[in-house]
Amino acid sequence: MLSGLMNFLNACLWPRSDQQARSASDSGGRQEGLLWFRDSGQHVFGDFSMAVVQANSLLEDQSQLESGSLSSHDSGPFGTFVGVYDGHGGPETSRFINDHMFHHLKRFTAEQQCMSSEVIKKAFQATEEGFLSIVTNQFQTRPQIATVGSCCLVSVICDGKLYVANAGDSRAVLGQVMRVTGEAHATQLSAEHNASIESVRRELQALHPDHPDIVVLKHNVWRVKGIIQVSRSIGDVYLKRSEFNREPLYAKFRLRSPFSKPLLSAEPAITVHTLEPHDQFIICASDGLWEHMSNQEAVDIVQNHPRNGIAKRLVKVALQEAAKKREMRYSDLKKIDRGVRRHFHDDITVIVVFFDTNLVSRGSMLRGPAVSVRGAGVNLPHNTLAPCTTPTQAAAAGAS
């Protein structure tokens, strides 16, 4: 019976092209079915590990690790940039962030000649404005582009500091190991913006007193205007600019009551942490991981296993838990193809970055070979914004 169910589920989606799956990244990672991973690599201040598992028909999670100069000037400062972009409504916004966020950060770092919270904030703003310009240009012919958005988590290691900026519900968790006891302690550095959090609902209600329905409990899930769970994001322009909440936008996306100021924000919450010797690593992941494990569970897994392949291990544990919740075997879950797989778990992206205390202490002038890695999956062609893409078109584009 279970075998028949697997065959039915696999038949619901078009065949996956292995060439298409591998074409999304040339960063040295490996592909096993819907799982992409880079078991190990080196950044300016230590080691890293990355993994991505796809659940959606088109991968909505995007991610990158950039290490080397954090400025458009070769003189530095030097450091490591990590980005996890969890898209919703399609992959267009997260793909756009992946292509532009780091370049904006380098530009503003060059202008200020240093890394700072203000630099990161400006990079978020410039990325948001860039995507807004695309929506403006395409709205009449592709109105649904206004409904696509992405959470955005950025971590920057530079000059002995760890900057964590977040808009949405991805999460960055610091692993600290106490030298006396050897115990690992999890510290969440990112603030989350999800309507399921009471403080977020209170913030929204205070910002929008004229909208009694600013947060609505719908099917036991709190949502902004009954539509979206996150209160901060890049994109989602139809909930930020009223001129994009009208025809030709589909009626199901249009609000009944007008609004004069943005209902969602793109401004990140930023934390700056001075790295200490007991700070051993940071886990940056989309909410697909955190749905299946706690901060402490994730930190314990990293602490108690080899660094090589640790991101893949975290993803595997999350998938095993997802299978357990559905009373099925992990081996059977892996047989379910993208698209249908989304009924069992979300896209999951995990990047684990380790800190070498000796390297961190040498500061932002530490030079090293430039490193640029992007997570992979079955994706839209580069620089293509096509919300109307059909499965047949997507397969054809990936094969070309």
Swiss-Prot record:
Modified residues (Phosphoserine): 75
Binding, Mn(2+) 1: 86-87
InterPro entries attached to this UniProt entry: PP2C, PP2C_BS, PPM-type-like_dom_sf, PPM-type_phosphatase-like_dom
Domain (PPM-type phosphatase) ranges: 47-355
Disruption phenotype: Slight increase in hypocotyl length. Plants missing PP2C42/PP2C-D2, PP2C64/PP2C-D5, PP2C79/PP2C-D7, PP2C63/PP2C-D8 and PP2C68/PP2C-D9 exhibit an increased hypocotyl length, as well as an enhanced sensitivity to LiCl and media acidification.
Keyword check for Magnesium: yes
Named cofactor requirement(s): Mg(2+); Mn(2+)
Keyword Magnesium among UniProt keywords: yes
Residues annotated for Mn(2+) 2 binding in this entry: 86, 287, 346
EC main group: hydrolase
Signal peptide per UniProt: none
Any GO MF annotation of the entry: protein serine/threonine phosphatase activity
Pfam families: PP2C
Catalytic activity, as annotated: O-phospho-L-seryl-[protein] + H2O = L-seryl-[protein] + phosphate; O-phospho-L-threonyl-[protein] + H2O = L-threonyl-[protein] + phosphate
Alphabetically ordered keywords of this record: Hydrolase, Magnesium, Manganese, Metal-binding, Phosphoprotein, Protein phosphatase
EC number(s) recorded for this UniProt protein: 3.1.3.16
Cofactor note: Binds 2 magnesium or manganese ions per subunit.
Quaternary assembly: Interacts with SAUR19.
Family: Belongs to the PP2C family.
Role: Dephosphorylates and represses plasma membrane H(+)-ATPases (PM H(+)-ATPases, e.g. AHA1 and AHA2), thus influencing negatively plant growth and fitness.
Name of the protein: Probable protein phosphatase 2C 64
Name of the encoding gene: PP2C64
